[in-house]
Structure formats: structure tokens, C-alpha cells
UniProtKB/Swiss-Prot annotation:
Superkingdom of origin: Bacteria
Gene that encodes it: pyrF
Phylogenetic placement of the source organism: Bacteria, Pseudomonadati, Pseudomonadota, Alphaproteobacteria, Hyphomicrobiales
Protein name: Orotidine 5'-phosphate decarboxylase
Gene3D superfamilies according to UniProt: Aldolase class I
Residues that bind substrate: 16, 38, 65-74, 119, 180, 189, 209-210
Organism: Methylorubrum populi (strain ATCC BAA-705 / NCIMB 13946 / BJ001) (Methylobacterium populi)
PROSITE patterns: OMPDECASE
């Protein structure tokens, strides 16, 4: 399991907010309690990519959760553009052609993460989508493919971390959304753990959104999460 020099890097704050102004306010309130921020579709379509570039220039780390999946050339060029923004992580869907294209487009400093199965999915959802395998087996299969292709890490639920680690080895990254501090509501995530449980399960980075973005004191919540992971 790769170790970060700064324990704050283990926490990725999900900026699932409506606009850049709201994201700026939250980042300011969190201050030095967090160093790593995730930008997904909602904010990306509202000026979030320029904001990500600005965060990178200010020394923050950024995770562009764009889940790319298209023809190879489009993915490859899209990854190059993300790299030019100074992003640290970028997600693609874990389809072999997509992953190979992403690896071709990857620049220095950018790590590609493959999304195996959304953490909001359970076995019933996977079956409805037409997959014959249960979620755990599908995650393991895709993790093996990703490792063989040269992907840097895997996005998966904490419950699958052990199986994924066995497929990608000790140097691969495991990034887990659906993390909720003790007592927080699960929201739309179906497979969740606390930060401490996730760290004990071998997770490298945890993604936390609403428990921080909706908190009265987001800085304090971020500090508590980092401390919980440090003490594991």
C-alpha cells in the first residue's frame, strides 16, 4: 500500500457543489485541514475544470472524477487535456479499450484510476444492468484487467479492497468513495465504511463529500477524519 508523505493526502474532499463560488468558500473554510479535492460532473460543467487548474497552481491536489469512456482516440486526447490542468487523479471506466487509451494519454504527474463498479451498485443493480457476475467478482475481474494494462489504481467500495489489493499488488492505489464518519447517514451509497475501517482495510485514499460539505464546521470534520485514519 503506497504511503503518502502527508497524512492529509489520504482524505479527498468531494466538491459536489453547484458552482465555483460555493467550492471556493468551502475550500477556504477547510483551510489547511485538507489538501486533496475531487471535482465531478456537477462542478466540472460549471467552471470546475478551470477551478481545478487554479487549485493545482496553489499547491492543492485535484481528482477529476470524470469517468471517461469513449472511443480510444477521444479518451487518449481527453486524458492529455486533464494532465495539462495539473490534475493528480483522473477516473476512467474499467473497460479494456478505454483503459489502454488512458494509459497512452497519461502525462507525468497524472495517475489514472479505473472505476470498476459504482459504489452505489449492489448485486441487484448489476444484474439489472445485464452483468452475469455479482459485484465482488466483477470488481475483481476488472481490477486484474486494469493492473495488466498499467492503470495506476482502482476506485472501489471498501468491502472489495482486500480482493482488489490481491489483484493489483502492493504498489497500486485503492481509492474509495462511500466513506462516512461514524453516525453519518449513508445517503445513496449502499456499501459504506468509516474512515478508520477503510484505512484498516488497506485503502490509500478515502473520498468524503456530504459529511464535510454539509457540516457546520467542515474544517473540524476533515481534521477528525484525517486523525482517525492516522490512528489505525
Amino acid at each position: 500500500m503506497p504511503e503518502s508523505a502527508d497524512p492529509r493526502d489520504r482524505l479527498i474532499v468531494a466538491l459536489d457543489l453547484p458552482d465555483v463560488a460555493a467550492a471556493e468558500r468551502l475550500v477556504a473554510r477547510i483551510g489547511d485541514a485538507a489538501t486533496f479535492y475531487k471535482i465531478g460532473y456537477r462542478l466540472a460543467y460549471a467552471g470546475g475544470l478551470d477551478f481545478a487548474a487554479r487549485l493545482a497552481r496553489e499547491g492543492k491536489k485535484t481528482f477529476l472524477d470524470l469517468k471517461l469512456h469513449d472511443i480510444g482516440n477521444t479518451v487518449e486526447e481527453g486524458v492529455r487535456s486533464a494532465s495539462a490542468l495539473g490534475a493528480t487523479f483522473l477516473t476512467v471506466h474499467a473497460y479494456p479499450q478505454t483503459m489502454r487509451a488512458a494509459v497512452r494519454g497519461r502525462g507525468p504527474g497524472l495517475k489514472i484510476l479505473a472505476v470498476t463498479v459504482l459504489t452505489s451498485y449492489d448485486d441487484a443493480d448489476a444484474a439489472e444492468a445485464g452483468y452475469a457476475l455479482p459485484v465482488a467478482d466483477l470488481v475483481a475481474q476488472r481490477a486484474s484487467q486494469a493492473a495488466a494494462i498499467g492503470i495506476d489504481g482502482i476506485v472501489c467500495a471498501a468491502a472489495e479492497a482486500g480482493a482488489v489489493r490481491g489483484r493489483i499488488g502492493p504498489s497500486g492505489l485503492i481509492v474509495t468513495p462511500g466513506i462516512r464518519p461514524a453516525g453519518a447517514e449513508a445517503g445513496d451509497q449502499k456499501r459504506v465504511m468509516t474512515p478508520g475501517q477503510a484505512r484498516a482495510a488497506g485503502i490509500d485514499h478515502v473520498v468524503v463529500g456530504r459529511p464535510i460539505t454539509g457540516a457546520g464546521d467542515p474544517r473540524a470534520v476533515a481534521r477528525t477524519i484525517v486523525a482517525e485514519m492516522e490512528n489505525v
